[in-house]
Structures are given as C-alpha cells and as structure tokens.
Amino acid sequence: MKHFKLFLLPLLAMTLVFSSCEQQDLSLTYIEPIQDWGKSPQDILEKMTKSKSGATLEYSESDDGYYYMEFKSYGISQYLAYAFIDNKLVGCATSQSSITYKQTIKNHIDKKHTLIQVDTNEDYEEYLYCNKEKTSSILFFIDNIYGEMEQFYIPYIEGDIEDFWNALE
C-alpha cells in the first residue's frame, strides 16, 4: 500500500504542475527533458531568448559551473537553474523561489555525477518517479509546506532499474 501511495502522489503532482503552467502560461519556462539533454549553455540561452511573448532572460554563471537563470514572462518571474557537465546539459530545476531552486540544484546535481536523496520531514516531501516508457527520464518533485511545486529532470540511466535504486543508497 505504501508503494502504491508513492506511485500516486507523483502522478497527482504532475497534474498540478501542468495545470498550473496552463493557467499562468508559464509553459515556456520548462525545457523538454529529453530533447535538450547534451545541449550547450549557448544552445539553451538561444532557445530561451527566442521564446515568444517578449520574455526576458537574465543569467549568471557561478564558480561551481552552474548557470542560474531568471525567466520573466507576463509579469511573472520563474527561476531556472541548469547544470552543465563538460559543457553539456545534465539537469535543471525550476521554482518560483530563488532560494529554493538554488538549493535544490546544488543538493541534487554536482559536476561529476547526479546525486539524489529521497527524504520526508515536516517541512517537505521528496519523491522519485520513473516513467520509463513515456519520458525515459527520472522526474523529481518537491512539495514543501509553502505549497511550492518544483520539477527536476535527470537523464534516465539505461540498465536494470533495481541496480539504479541500489546505486542511490
């Protein structure tokens, strides 16, 4: 029953995220999780700045190799963080809180490999959800006490899924 609940919660979270994007017209802020993997920072910037609605993009590169971006559209700010390894996109996080998204991306991606920690406490809940057939990627959600929803993509790792879970422990 516990595993069944863990399966349903991310599905509900996905519904909330995507319906929220439609209502606030923030869909432009989300990159395609599969199509954009391996792209350079320049490719991502070019794609984002070409988006419609007169959106603006401000970005900065930190010493640890992360790109922090603020995407503004329709008067709404959406904070983006992208991680690049060897000049290739390996992960991204989005949030409407600049503090939250920076901490998220630093906690779960480093310059050499992807780190994931699943935890639950009274402040937030983290879920890992693997939809191997549809997205070939891992979709990571955080739903904290402030009601913020974040989505976090990493590439799906080929091989036995049990080996993948064991590697995370």
Region annotations inferred by a language model:
Residues 6, 38, 151-154:
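Intrinsic structural disorder/low-complexity segments
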Residues 8-11, 27, 154-155:
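Alpha-helical interaction segments
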Residues 21-110, 157-169:
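Short helix/turn-capping signatures at newly exposed starts of structured segments
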Residues 94-169:
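Extracytoplasmic electrostatic interaction patches
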Residues 1-19:
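Sec-dependent bacterial lipoprotein signal peptides
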Residues 17-19, 55, 124, 137:
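Short intrinsically disordered, low-complexity segments
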